[in-house]
């Protein structure tokens, strides 16, 4: 796919190879270390949540916030070509296959799942680093999926990306001032004689010494490099930020600092986040609403309390069972581990029907024949499972313990079940296959 180099320049940083990453040693000058030693946090015997909550509370959901970004039936198929002189398309990698979600204005949506499920591809589709195979991405009346590169250029300033690896996402041959100031020059946001002052202002916003604008990336630690990446993403005052696992490459103490910084930025600039991560503890702290992906599909989406206390999809339950929970331990309980059998199927040839059925202990014949719809079973809760009509009461004893229902204060919620909420959000199927009656039923 051919893209306008000027359009891409402000969104995608220069990618450098492994050698460049090795040259960016994790060293910090004595001056910078002394100036910002107050940012360092001891993490002995602490987890992410306890560190993050020292100065920041978990983000809250605003149910009345309008959507700034609406994604509908988004698809991304990468062609697989044969070898030889005549290269033919012999298949497609279905990286993203028909997902739908909304990102609220000034809010955040978490996107979680195993490696290879399509999370990062989704983020690159939102920023139009990839052009979608199908579907729509509505942003302020514009369908980003249908725009040409030329039409996208003025909108790129509104949708920016924070990349995962702070060591390879910064060009080691450019100074911090050049890296952060590049988007300003591409879009001519400010006169050239004001670029430096704007760069220094942004460095101060992200907690770096503004006088270090003339230093190179290898003179900063990993956490500070990620702050540089955040400053670059903020340069154009975006309305949507796609954070692609922004803290996965950092130490846990630095993770908490960076996530708290992102919260401060969200509160100060009213920017919306699509927060991509595989660390469920971080997502729980930052995102009041979470979507769970598996093999290119969204299998469950809901608010924080519902997803973490009363997950309905077997895959979500398995993910959460693998997360150490200090709140469970605080009330004397434990969460039994759900171990998934087998490997994740190939996205080139995914299973028929439900894509999770090959690893699901509750799979039935209907799961192989019919793909489950994303069913709305609560006001802000949707599940893609044929047995969602039983509201979590699967046809076998639940693998997770009763203490899985724990509120945000760590108190157990006995017999936690979804609330009997009226279906208020249109656009989702309201029927499912009931295992007990062996027929399709409705809400």
Feature-to-residue mapping (PLM):
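Helix-to-loop junction immediately C-terminal to a conserved catalytic motif
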Residues: 127
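Conserved ABC transporter NBD signature motif
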Residues: 135-143, 155
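Conserved ABC ATPase signature
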Residues: 216-220, 224
């Amino acid at each position: 796919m051919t893209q306008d180099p000027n359009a891409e320049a402000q969104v995608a940083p220069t990618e450098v190879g492994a050698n460049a990453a090795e040259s960016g040693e994790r060293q910090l000058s004595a001056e910078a270390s002394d100036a910002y030693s107050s940012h360092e946090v001891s993490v002995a015997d602490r987890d992410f949540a306890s560190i993050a909550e020292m100065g920041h509370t978990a983000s809250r959901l605003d149910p009345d916030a309008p959507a700034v970004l609406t994604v509908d039936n988004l698809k991304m198929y990468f062609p697989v070509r044969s070898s030889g002189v005549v290269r033919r398309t012999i298949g497609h990698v279905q990286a993203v296959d028909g997902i739908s979600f909304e990102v609220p204005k000034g809010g955040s949506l978490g996107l979680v799942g195993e490696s290879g499920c399509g999370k990062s591809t989704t983020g690159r589709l939102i920023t139009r680093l990839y052009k979608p195979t199908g579907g729509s991405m509505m942003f302020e009346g514009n369908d980003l999926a249908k725009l040409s590169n030329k039409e996208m250029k003025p909108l790129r300033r509104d949708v920016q990306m924070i990349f995962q690896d702070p060591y390879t996402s910064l060009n080691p041959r450019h100074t911090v001032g050049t890296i952060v100031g590049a988007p300003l020059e591409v879009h001519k946001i400010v006169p050239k004689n004001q670029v430096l002052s704007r760069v220094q202002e942004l460095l101060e916003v992200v907690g770096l010494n503004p006088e270090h604008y003339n230093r190179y990336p290898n003179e900063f630690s990993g956490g500070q490099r990620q702050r540089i990446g955040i400053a670059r993403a903020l340069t154009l005052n975006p309305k949507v930020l796609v954070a692609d696992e922004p803290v996965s490459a950092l130490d846990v103490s630095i993770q908490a600092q960076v996530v708290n910084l992102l919260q401060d930025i969200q509160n100060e600039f009213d920017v919306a986040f699509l927060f991509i991560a595989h660390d469920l503890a971080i997502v729980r702290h930052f995102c009041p609403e979470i979507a769970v992906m598996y093999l290119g599909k969204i299998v469950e989406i809901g608010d924080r309390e519902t997803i973490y206390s009363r997950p309905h999809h077997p895959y979500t339950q398995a993910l959460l069972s693998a997360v150490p929970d200090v709140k469970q331990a605080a009330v004397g309980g434990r969460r039994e581990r759900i171990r998934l059998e087998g490997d994740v199927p190939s996205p080139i040839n995914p299973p028929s029907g439900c894509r999770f059925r090959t690893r699901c202990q509750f799979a039935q014949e209907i799961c192989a024949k019919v793909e489950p719809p994303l069913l709305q079973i609560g006001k802000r809760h949707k599940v893609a499972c044929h047995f969602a009509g039983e509201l979590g009461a699967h046809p076998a004893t639940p693998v997770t313990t009763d203490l899985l229902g724990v509120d945000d204060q760590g108190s157990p919620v006995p017999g936690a079940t979804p609330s009997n909420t009226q279906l208020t959000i249109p656009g989702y199927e309201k029927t499912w296959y009931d295992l007990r009656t062996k027929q399709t039923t409705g809400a």
